[in-house]
């Protein structure tokens, strides 16, 4: 099982049990939780159960490291090796990196990992309709909208798909700029 992947100036380190409390604190912060489908407070016990469930080859959760700092979390989960698909996700906790090229570096590294290392053919993203930043970000990456499901708060969960070839086309356009820095 791969524990570290570096590309585009970021390093993705597989989430380990000693880091789950940091991730829980990030995840419980309203600046992060308000964009998540599950918005309830996460207890330490809930976090331990979650980690036990996702610590396997069907889920890769990575701490994002940029310039020797842990700045967020990215993942591919629910990998279906039969259909060659998985669901991607990202959150950058450190505000100073939000409106920079760093989220692109992270998602390019994750998608390269998924398409090149895991040999997936497509990625899915579920995004809450009030998360305009994530919607625009995913559209720029080449994701295409599929459908939506409304939750009890009247916020819709939107589904987007990214095919491998569409991703590489978009990535190559952006990567030329990223690699010059």
Which role fits each region the language model picked out?
Residues 1-22, 27-29, 67-181:
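Acyl-donor (CoA/ACP) binding surface of acyl/acetyltransferases
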Residues 17-24, 44, 48, 52:
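An amphipathic alpha-helix signature
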Residues 29-32, 56:
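Short helix-loop boundary/capping segments at the starts of domains
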Residues 31-49:
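Conserved GNAT-fold acetyl-CoA-binding loop/helix
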Residues 37, 61-62, 121:
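Short, polar/charged, Gly/Pro-enriched helix-capping and turn/loop motifs at alpha-helix termini
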Residues 42-45, 54-55, 92-93:
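Juxtamembrane/interface motifs at transmembrane-helix termini
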Residues 51-63, 72:
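A short helix-loop-beta-strand connector motif used in the catalytic cores of GNAT acetyltransferases and
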């Amino acid at each position: 099982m791969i524990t570290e992947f570096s590309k585009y100036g970021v390093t993705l380190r597989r989430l380990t049990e000693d880091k789950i409390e940091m991730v829980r604190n990030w995840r419980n912060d309203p600046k992060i939780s308000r964009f998540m489908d599950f918005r309830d407070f996460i207890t330490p016990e809930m976090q331990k159960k979650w980690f036990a469930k996702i610590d396997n080859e069907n889920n890769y959760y990575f701490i994002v490291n940029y310039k020797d700092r842990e700045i967020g979390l990215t993942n591919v989960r629910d990998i279906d090796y039969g259909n060659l698909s998985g669901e991607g996700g990202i959150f950058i906790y450190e505000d100073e990196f939000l409106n920079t090229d760093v989220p692109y570096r992270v998602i390019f590294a994750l998608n390269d990992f998924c398409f090149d290392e895991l040999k997936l053919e497509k990625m899915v993203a579920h995004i809450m309709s009030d998360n305009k930043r994530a919607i625009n970000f995913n559209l720029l990456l080449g994701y295409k909208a599929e459908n939506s499901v409304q939750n009890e708060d009247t916020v819709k969960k939107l589904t987007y798909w990214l095919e491998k070839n569409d991703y590489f086309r978009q990535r190559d356009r952006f990567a030329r700029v990223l690699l010059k820095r």
